[in-house]
Regions:
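Phosphate/nucleotide-binding beta-alpha loop and adjacent structural elements of enzyme active sites
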Residues: 1-239
Length: 239
């Protein structure tokens, strides 16, 4: 576990420089006071980062993993936010229901999708993490699922300044669950993996086409360090 923590901390340090580019973009193009949706919150790293540069009118965190959620809850409570925030131990998709999350021991790779154990990329990752048995890499945990539309309607939310999605290959399903309330969403900021480690059953072109059809345009693209992944920001042309 120490070695896995060391790997994660090293990646977090490297990602800091990537995140500076993201923050710079939003400081230039967004309001100082924001309503923020963090889908795939993990331990609250993104909330902590944005809280240093923006004032939250309110924020909503979604973390499907009950294990990750306990750490998220502790970390957010320690930040002592005075404005409204909502911590949701639930997965998001295109419908309401139940499912499973594959909880990895390197917790940031946890995903609702299945892993492709024939993937050379995954085999290399397991080797780096010194995991020799696939079954020791993850365990299945039952979770509840809802959609963004369902949540937004229940909470009577009328504006989202930034919707961030980082759900390890489940991003497209979450975007499909925003078929009504995309109209109130200014920016969608998400990560897309081009490796074959996870069985996504969609391509980046599917996300791009869907967002274009909803009236969004791509305004930012940046490759993440040491990974076959990119971060994208799309802006609603009608807000």
């Amino acid at each position: 576990m120490f070695f896995i923590s060391l790997i994660r901390n090293s990646l977090n340090f490297i990602d800091y420089f990537q995140q500076k580019k993201i923050i710079k973009f939003f400081k230039k193009n967004s309001n100082k006071k924001i309503i923020f949706f963090d889908v795939g919150s993990h331990y609250g790293e993104t909330i902590k980062l944005f809280s240093k540069e923006f004032m939250f009118e309110q924020f909503h965190c979604f973390e499907a993993s009950p294990i990750n959620f306990e750490e998220l809850k502790k970390n957010i409570e320690n930040l002592n936010f005075k404005n409204k925030y909502y911590l949701n131990n639930i997965g998001l998709g295109y419908d309401v229901g139940e499912g499973f999350i594959n909880q990895t021991y390197e917790t940031s790779s946890s995903t609702i999708n299945d892993f492709n154990f024939d993937s050379k990329y995954l085999k290399r990752k397991l080797k780096i993490l010194n995991i020799k048995n696939d079954k020791k890499f993850y365990k299945k945990i039952p979770i509840k699922l809802t959609s963004l539309d369902n949540y937004i309607n229940e909470k009577k939310i009328n504006k989202i300044d930034i919707l961030k999605i980082d759900t390890e290959g489940y991003e497209y399903n979450i975007i499909k669950g925003l078929s009504q309330n995309y109209k109130i969403t200014k920016f969608i900021y998400f990560e897309h993996h081009y490796d074959d480690m996870i069985k996504k059953n969609y391509k980046f072109s599917n996300i791009n086409e869907t967002l274009k059809n909803l009236g969004f345009k791509k305004v930012f693209k940046s490759k993440m360090y040491f990974r076959k992944s990119f971060e994208y920001i799309y802006e609603n042309k009608f807000i």
